C-alpha cells in the first residue's frame, strides 16, 4: 500500500496538501513514526482557521494582476521580468544543472542541516514534479520544483542565489508561477509550505 507520508528533516510529513484531512488516527501515526525511525510526525488540522496560531502555511488563493500590487512591488516585478526569463523546463535541465545551484544556495543559508550528496539530491528530484527555470543571460541560475496534487500546487523547493536579490529574481518567479497556476490552470491555491524555522527567508512575504 502506498504511504501518505514521507520523511523530511528527521520527521514525517503528509504527502498531500494541507487542506486534505489526515485519515489515520494517532495510534496509526505513532506506529508509522516507529517504523520510519523519525522523531515526530507533522500534519495539519483545522486548515484555514480564523484564529491565529504559532504555526501556519503560506498560501495564495487569489490571482493578482500586475496592477493589483503596490507601486513599489509592481516596479520590482517589472525589473525582475526584464532581468530574467522564467519558464517551465523538463526535469533533465534540473538533473543536469541543479546540483551546483543547490550547493551554492545551501551555503548561503544559516542552516542546521547538512548538504545532500549529489546522489541524494538527484533522488529528491524524482516523482511527479513540474520544474520552472530562472534564466539570467540565458544561463540557469535558479529553479522551482513544484508538486500539483488535489487541485493545489506546492512550491516544494525553490533555489535562487541571494546575489540575484537586487535584480528581483524571486519576484519574477513568483509572479509568473502564480499567474500560471491560479489564472491559467485555475487551481485552488498555491503554497510555499509551512512557516520556515530552519533558515531565514523573505520569499514567503510575497505570497501572503
Annotated model-derived regions:
Residues 27-33, 74-77, 118-123, 178, ...:
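Short amphipathic alpha-helical segments and helix-helix/interface helices
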Residues 1-10, 41-50, 59-166, 181:
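A conserved beta-strand-loop-helix scaffold within acyl/acetyltransferase catalytic domains
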Amino acid at each position: 500500500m502506498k504511504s501518505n507520508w514521507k520523511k523530511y528533516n528527521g520527521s514525517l510529513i503528509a504527502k498531500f496538501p494541507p487542506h486534505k484531512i489526515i485519515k489515520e488516527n494517532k495510534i496509526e501515526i505513532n506506529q508509522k513514526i516507529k517504523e520510519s525511525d523519525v522523531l515526530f510526525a507533522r500534519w495539519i488540522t483545522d486548515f484555514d482557521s480564523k484564529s491565529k496560531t504559532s504555526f501556519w502555511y503560506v498560501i495564495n488563493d487569489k490571482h493578482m494582476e500586475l496592477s493589483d500590487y503596490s507601486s513599489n512591488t509592481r516596479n520590482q516585478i517589472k525589473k525582475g521580468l526584464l532581468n530574467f526569463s522564467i519558464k517551465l523546463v523538463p526535469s533533465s535541465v534540473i538533473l543536469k544543472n541543479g546540483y551546483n545551484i543547490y550547493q551554492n544556495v545551501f551555503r548561503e543559508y544559516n542552516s542546521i542541516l547538512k548538504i545532500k550528496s549529489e546522489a541524494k539530491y538527484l533522488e529528491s528530484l524524482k516523482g511527479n514534479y513540474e520544474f520552472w527555470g530562472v534564466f539570467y543571460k540565458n544561463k540557469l541560475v535558479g529553479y522551482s520544483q513544484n508538486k500539483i496534487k488535489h487541485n493545489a500546487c506546492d512550491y516544494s523547493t525553490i533555489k535562487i542565489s541571494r546575489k540575484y536579490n537586487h535584480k528581483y529574481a524571486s519576484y519574477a518567479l513568483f509572479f509568473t508561477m502564480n499567474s500560471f497556476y491560479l489564472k491559467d490552470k485555475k487551481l485552488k491555491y498555491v503554497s510555499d509550505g509551512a512557516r520556515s524555522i530552519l533558515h531565514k527567508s523573505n520569499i514567503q512575504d510575497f505570497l501572503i
